[in-house]
Amino acid sequence: MQVPRIAVTVDLVILTVRDQQLCALVWRREAEPYAGRLALAGGFIRLDEDLSSAAARVLAQRAGLEGAPVHLEQLRTYGYPDRDPRQRVVSVAYLGIAPDLPVPSAAQMSWYPFTSLTAAAMAFDHARILKEGVERARAKLEYTPLGAAFCPDEFTVAELRRVYEIVWGTSLDPRNFHRKVTGAERFLVPTGASTARDGGRPAKLFRRGPADLLHPPMLRPRGPQD
């Protein structure tokens, strides 16, 4: 029996909050197929590397984010037979979360608002991968401290609330949010310092605590705004 030849890639859904918008890192393809369309940072897996090593290499070399504080986790695998017209390609997608970062060093890579990255604008099945990555991030904000990965090392509760509002796409009551995040066990650790960078009264600065899961969870509002 002849073993079919299948290529394997890693593709990265890298998200950040820039200019009060949820943004993803993409680049514009110059060659066919899908010339002129936007695509996620990705690359073929080498014979001498495992999946996590390939993802780290693509993050550093293709995405231009070497050394950046990016939370990276495996999202899922995509293997539809016709997802790449050139050959059979299986993609292992990763989700990356980062605080606001400058324009990456890699040529052609740019931050685009998530709402502008429609299926018609993107190559292959990357719009689907991106959408599922965003939904993973939205869901994990409910029960893990992942929201802090969008923030700098030290942040205020108001800055963290804005992350939740932007990622979830909804408004949150400031007092209720403050009560919930400060009441969640080991979610936030006070630094003992404060800042007035929000333009109002000095606000306390926090760091992410050691919690892996939020107890109680931060439930996303349901309704017309979802």
Which residue stretches match the model-derived regions?
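Short, well-ordered beta-strand micro-motif
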Residues: 14-16, 26, 95-97, 205-207
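Short helix-coil junctions and helix-kink-helix linkers
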Residues: 162-171
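Long, intrinsically disordered, low-complexity Ser/Thr/Pro-rich regulatory/activation regions
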Residues: 189-226
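Active-site segment of metal-dependent pyrophosphate-handling enzymes
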Residues: 6-10, 23, 52-105, 138-147, ...
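NUDIX/MutT-family hydrolases
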Residues: 93-96, 103-142, 152-158, 162-163, ...
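N-terminal strand-loop-strand
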Residues: 1-38
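Active-site-proximal cofactor/substrate-binding loop regions of enzyme domains
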Residues: 30-33, 37-51, 55, 60
